[in-house]
Structure formats: structure tokens, C-alpha cells
């Protein structure tokens, strides 16, 4: 089932929901990462794989990721991308969970999964919604280190915006300085370490040891702060072998392993 929700700043975004009869009261909610979207690469296959293994699964677009309802796999709205923020992504997750609980009922137990930046977001929001479990895939452990320092930061402030190159599409992706101001103004609510230490629910942390986008060290930090073990996927990059576009009907082996670990973890959590 495809649907829409009203996210941060009233922006309408899309989601995909597939329900199972095996676990009617448990729902996986998946948050994508930076320069990602719900239909990126293998995420549709991931959703199908979870459903095949008895878990209802929802994936959604954060409201300011740059894609649109009309062009859900293209960065067609760079103004929205430039004005995104971590606080907006928190608001998006809040909006989609609230809407889904209204539609499916308050008895629904939420299991959050977040990839990369989405991993940080699901940790930050887990306590607010008293979710049942959290899983991070190559999750970030520190938001502050995502921003430039020194002269680069000062130039960003003076110019009001800077750009980064999207290596896949070759687009110059704008980042407004307001993103950094949002971080400065909301640091307490964007403290991943502090949020990890508050969690009293099962946490599963997974990371590839060949990840060059988010260091393996960040996975170790999440595991340490949540008092769990880190699942390390040998020779796996940031996306566990997935690419955009993905033209196969099968998951890459490493991402398949990630899914198997996560599915087992969630089923074990349901039995607690």
C-alpha cells in the first residue's frame, strides 16, 4: 500500500506499507540515510524480504530529501534538500509514526531500523515513542562531526549555503547554513550518545568493516553506549553491497546477511 503523510513544515511525502498476518501487532519502520530515498537501490527488495519473513514493513521518504511525489527517485527539489535538518527528520519520523498508529491502532508495536543518518534519527526518536526495538545499519554516532570546521565553516556562514557533489547523479547538492544553526539550537535533542544511554529496549547495531562513509568506530560507539554487541559484516561497504539503481531481483549477499540478522533480532524481541 502506498500512501502520503504530512511531514516537517507541512511538506507531503510518500510511504510504502506492507502488512503481514503473522505478526499483526508488530511493524518495522525504516528510515533511509543522507542523499537517500525510500525506493533507493534494494530497499524495495528489503521490504519484500521482511514481509516474506513475517514482519510488516513501512518505509518512507523524509520530507526534505529532495525527491518529490511526482519524481520519487530523482532529486528534483534541491531547494527542499538544501533546507533539510536533523530536527526536520526527527519531525518526519514523529509524523509518520503518529499517522500509522492512528490508522492501524495504538496496539501496534514499532521496531525502528535506520540506515546511516537514519540510524542516528531512529536512536534519537526511540524513547519518545517507547518503541519496542531499534536497529542501526551503518548508523552515525555523532551529528556534530558531520559539519565542517574552521575556515570552511566560516565560509559557509558568510555565503549562507555550500554544495556537495552527488557522485551518482553529478548534481551539486545545496546545504543551507540553517542546517548548522538547527544543530546549534537543538544540540540536546540531537545527542545520539545521550539517547543511546537512555534506551532500555533491545538494540541491534550492524556495520560493515569496509565502510568509508561512516567509520566502523561509530558502530562500535553505538554498541558500547547501548550495551550490546556490534555485528560486523566482513568486507561490507556503507550500503552492504547495494547500489542505485539495482537491477537484480535478489539482495546482495552482505545486505541479505544484514536482513537475516535483523529479522532474527526482531523475532527474538517479539518473544520477550
Language-model regions: role of each:
Residues 198-199, 205-207, 211:
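Short beta-strand/loop motif that positions the catalytic acidic residue
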Residues 176-195:
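Active-site nucleophile elbow and catalytic-triad environment of alpha/beta-hydrolase enzymes
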Residues 43, 201, 214-224, 245:
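Short alpha-helix in the alpha/beta-hydrolase fold that links the catalytic acid
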Residues 22-66:
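Short, surface-exposed "cap/lid" segments of acyl-processing enzymes
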Residues 236, 240, 244-272:
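Catalytic active-site module of serine/aspartate enzymes centered on a nucleophile-bearing elbow/loop
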Residues 79-102:
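Alpha/beta-hydrolase active-site loop
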Residues 1-23:
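N-terminal cap/lid segment of alpha/beta-hydrolase-fold proteins
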Residues 128-176:
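Hydrolase active-site cap/lid region
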